[in-house]
Amino acid sequence: MCVMFLSLTAVDLRKLRIPGVLQRLSLCYLLVAAMETVFATADDRGKEKPWAWCRDVIYLLPEWLLSLSMLAVYLALTFALPVPGCPTGYIGPGGLHEGKTHVRCTGGAAGYIDRLVLGDSHIYGNPTPKAIYQTEAPYDPEGILGTLSAAFLCFLGLQAGRVFMTYQDHRGRLVRLVFWALVTGAIGAALCNCSKNDGIIPLNKNLWSVSFSLVTACFGYFLLAFLYVIVDILQLWGGEPFIFAGMNPLILYLCHDIFYRFFPVNFHVDPVHWKLLLKALWDVIIWLSLAFVLYCKKIFIAL
């Protein structure tokens, strides 16, 4: 029996982190939902037109223009905004990177904007590269600038939804999903030179780089097409148990974020790969069990 006591301490508002995962999700949803609310139409008025094969794009053309504009702003600020004491266009980790020549340039323009607007005390103080590059400047992976490229990825998800609304036959849906997978994948691969750290715009989740958004969208489109075949066309699988988690992702995220330090979710294991893997599987089982109970009780909490 494990007895757990939770101690609640006052939050120091002078050091409160303002950005975060849920905050970024809400901003991305706000931007994309606002565009969809203003420009969306449910009429398939171009079904018999010569451009019917690409009408999923035509229907979203104003939203495409706005989304690409957001992406253009992101790129312009990332690579053209002058950052005091740093090379223009720098997107490295700072610290020890390149012989300590850019010590406080972590994240380049993205980090500079966050520190300028929010202040050092209100963004993440232990960025991922700190362990390797001994960075000195705080950097927030869910900061202001990266929200623009993240919103573009969110819009690409909306494009997938438009495919299902526009094309009613299996073939039309699959063709469009694979088309978008190939387009986003090809552009993303070209930007990062099909590599992990190279290319014009390397893959970088902390910066939410354009290549990262496009490659992530590519895999998302391919996976959605595969699941559509397995679940909807061939009807070989109903989506369980993942459908349970998919109905309540917000509550599962919050529970994990709150209780991941405590038993029975967390407990000490030796830092051996197979033991850590089993512990991770145990975590998944716990939260899937909670999702299953909520599903059976028809309790669904969403944004």
Which residue stretches match the model-derived regions?
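Alpha-helical transmembrane segments and their immediate juxtamembrane cytosolic regions
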Residues: M1-L303
